[in-house]
Structure formats: C-alpha cells, structure tokens
C-alpha cells in the first residue's frame, strides 16, 4: 500500500560563496577624455612602441587610460581612474575591458602617468603611494608632455620606491622591461614636441607599427634596387622582365 503522505528529507540550504566580479561585470569607461590631445598622442606613442616590442614575446599586455581594479572595496565606488599607461608581463596576450588584478592574477609591472595641472599633485603623492604600498608596481614613471623637464622614475626596492637615476645618455632604464625610457625630439601625428618613448639598451628606438612598416618598405625597395643592378650587370633589362 502506498503511503499517501510520504516523508521527504529536508536539507539545509547550501550557500555558495559570492565570487568577485570580473571585467565583464565592472565599469570600464568613465566617459572622461584625456587632459589634452597631446596627452592622448603621448599615450598612443608609448602603447604603439610597446606593442611592436611585445611581438617578440609570447606573453604580455599593454594598456592605457583604462580602469585598474585592485581591491573589492574599490568596486563599490569609482574612486580611482586607471593609469595613463601600463605594462604587464607574464600574462596571456589578448584584449581586456579593464585590468582586474584578482581575475588576471597580477598587477602592472610598469606604470607611467602623464602629468597635467589638474593631476600632477595626485600623480606625485597619493597615486605614487598607491602604486608603492598597495598595488606594489615594480616601476613607476611620470612625465609632463608640456613640461618635459618634469619626469622621474622609481623602482620598488625593499618595499619602498627609490629614484631611478638617469644614465650617461640621459635615459631612465627599466630593469623590468630591459628597455630605456628616453626623451625624443620629433614629430608624431603632426605635433612637433618632446616625447618619451622606449629604446633598447643599445640606444635604438623601439619603432611604432607605422615606423616598422616604413622600415620594411624601405628594406624591400633596397633589395629590389640591388637585384635590378645585379641584373643590369648581367646584361638583363629588369624592366623587360
């Protein structure tokens, strides 16, 4: 005979721990433009040269003017705008909406802030302290695109930032990247100015993607010229081929 009132076992509810938010769940755009067009160009110059440098590596990410999340408390209020430029090594390549340290597994290895009248004091004090004591960024630099004499670099040593001294060539070396940050007098996006960009330890500028394409085109033209001269020496008209 079937029991009309079967006894069912009542189980205690299981509460799963709340997982921290990911980059897809966090704000990644504050709608605020950079301080000036030159600031934007300087950021793009740094990013572009870093991207060509990263082509030689299987890992690495470079970003700029994007949110950097370093604590769960920070997610409750948008109280910190991300670095103007940063590099992270030892991580898979690929696009990110924002940099979420607990999702990616590590923070930036190098940060550069571009100074402006409205941000310089913060970049030199509270942000520097944040990068040093909370996020613990190994190397931190700042530069003023309109006052190029105002630049500095710091390296984390013993838990504190120590100034990076300019070398004999006037550059600030990055031990993390194995590159040097140099001042470059030149034209970028129709602006003639003093910029900062990366150079190799031998002093060769790391090219942007556009510069790299020009170099490739020039090399191809030189090869074609050598071939044409060789054919002419053999009595062959290269234009007739």
Could you say what each language-model-derived stretch is?
Residues 138:
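Short acidic/polar active-site loop segments enriched in Thr and Asp
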Residues 61-63, 141-144:
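A structural signal for short, well-ordered beta-strand segments and their strand-loop junctions
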């Amino acid at each position: 005979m079937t029991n009309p009132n079967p006894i069912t076992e009542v189980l205690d509810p299981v509460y799963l721990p709340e997982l921290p938010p990911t980059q897809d769940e966090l704000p990644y755009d504050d709608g605020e433009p950079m301080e000036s067009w030159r600031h934007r160009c300087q950021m793009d110059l740094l990013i572009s040269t870093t991207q060509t440098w990263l082509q030689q590596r299987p890992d690495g990410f470079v970003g700029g003017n994007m949110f950097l999340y370093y604590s769960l408390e920070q997610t409750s209020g948008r109280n910190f705008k991300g670095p103007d430029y940063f590099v992270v090594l030892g991580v898979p390549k690929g696009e990110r909406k924002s940099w979420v340290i607990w999702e990616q597994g590590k923070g930036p290895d190098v940060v550069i802030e571009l100074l402006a009248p409205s941000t310089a004091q913060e970049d030199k004090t509270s942000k520097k302290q944040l990068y040093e004591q909370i996020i613990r960024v190994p190397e931190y630099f700042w530069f003023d695109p309109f006052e190029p004499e105002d630049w500095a670099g710091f390296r984390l040593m013993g838990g504190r930032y120590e100034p990076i001294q300019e070398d004999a060539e006037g550059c600030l070396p990055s031990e993390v990247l194995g590159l040097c940050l140099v001042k470059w007098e030149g034209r970028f996006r129709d602006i003639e100015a003093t910029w900062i960009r990366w150079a190799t330890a031998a002093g060769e500028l790391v090219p942007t993607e556009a510069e790299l394409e020009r170099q490739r085109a020039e090399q191809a033209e030189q090869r074609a010229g050598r071939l044409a001269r060789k054919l002419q020496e053999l009595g062959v008209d290269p234009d007739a081929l």
